[in-house]
From Swiss-Prot:
InterPro entries: Ribosome_recyc_fac, Ribosome_recyc_fac_dom, RRF_sf. Keywords: Cytoplasm, Protein biosynthesis. Disulfide bonds: none annotated. The gene is frr. Responsible for the release of ribosomes from messenger RNA at the termination of protein biosynthesis. May increase the efficiency of translation by recycling ribosomes from one round of translation to another. GO terms for biological process: translational termination. Belongs to the RRF family. One of its GO terms (molecular function) is ribosomal large subunit binding. It comes from Borreliella burgdorferi (strain ATCC 35210 / DSM 4680 / CIP 102532 / B31) (Borrelia burgdorferi). This is Ribosome-recycling factor.
Amino acid sequence: MEDYKAFLDEKMNKVLLSLDNEYKTLRTGRISSNIFDRICIQYHDRRTPITQVSSIRIPEARLVVIQPWDKSILNKIEQAILNSDLSMNPSNDGSVIRIKVPNLTSERRQEIVKHAKKIAEEHKISTRNIRQDLNNKVKKQEKESEITEDCLKRILDDIQKSTDMYIKKIDSILESKIQEIMEA
């Protein structure tokens, strides 16, 4: 039975880590270089995140400076940022890209909150799918007489309690992210 708990915790913690990584790429009131993690360009015949081909600095609260290691990709980076969903207007001076980051409008904040809720729901679904897979494995063991019916009920109950706990964690992470988006 302990094997199920360890397996469940490992899978559920991966879901929480994935949620955290996705939330790092959302723009909030505070600017972070993580928002550029998902922006990619074609570089040496493969899609490459701009974070891997340039340095990204934030010298001021509302200014981002992107300095590619290869100047020939400046235009590609600029175009990728323009085509992204970040609503930013980069300025290319021939050696670096500067982005003056405007304050988020209330409409844009609402869009980001909506997207954050969608991401949280996707991760809740992943959590429920993990629960369903584990429930099916345990039920199969009971059918094959590897565990008793009482043990099955106890394990299923533990799985449900753990699932509920992880879904509450996802809700808590979502609430703090919404608060972060709405302030500043």
